[in-house]
Amino acid sequence: MFDTTLLILLGLAALGFISHNTTVAISILVLIIVRVTPLNTFFPWIEKQGLTVGIIILTIGVMAPIASGTLPPSTLIHSFMNWKSLLAIAVGVFVSWLGGRGVSLMGTQPHLVAGLLVGTVLGVALFRGVPVGPLIAAGIISLFIGKS
């Protein structure tokens, strides 16, 4: 039987390879493997917990320089004494807030997820973005449609 979903995933993986974005390509190939093997029984868990696991892994990656000591405490302290660093802190707070609104919106408005995913994959593949886009994009959408 013809599997349209598999064809779409293969197309998106190809787009990831063509654009030299291995993050997208590998992610989609992993999902294809899960789809075509008995691992597909894990999709409900992946759909429910995947975003949380991804955020945890992303946070570990961001916090690793602090934990390893390559970002010394003095640098952290100085970040409160420079206007550019203070601006970076403010932007970080704002974007985190947007991401939080985005997670809520994606949970309550699942029909928006498809558009967010397509937009994110295109942004990652064509414009060298990173796949944190759906959360922030959903947060921005929540500002326009008034949902939190």
Curated annotation (Swiss-Prot):
Highest taxon above the source species: Bacteria
Presence of keyword Cell membrane: yes
Chief place of localization: membrane
Membrane topology listed for this record: Multi-pass membrane protein
Keyword tags: Cell membrane, Membrane, Transmembrane, Transmembrane helix
Residue ranges crossing the lipid bilayer per the database entry: 14-34, 51-71, 86-106, 121-141
Protein location: Cell membrane
GO CC terms: plasma membrane
InterPro entries: UPF0756_TM (IPR007382)
Signal peptide coordinates: none
Family note: Belongs to the UPF0756 family.
PANTHER family associated with the record: UPF0756 MEMBRANE PROTEIN YEAL
Name the record gives this protein: UPF0756 membrane protein KPK_3307
Organism of origin: Klebsiella pneumoniae (strain 342)
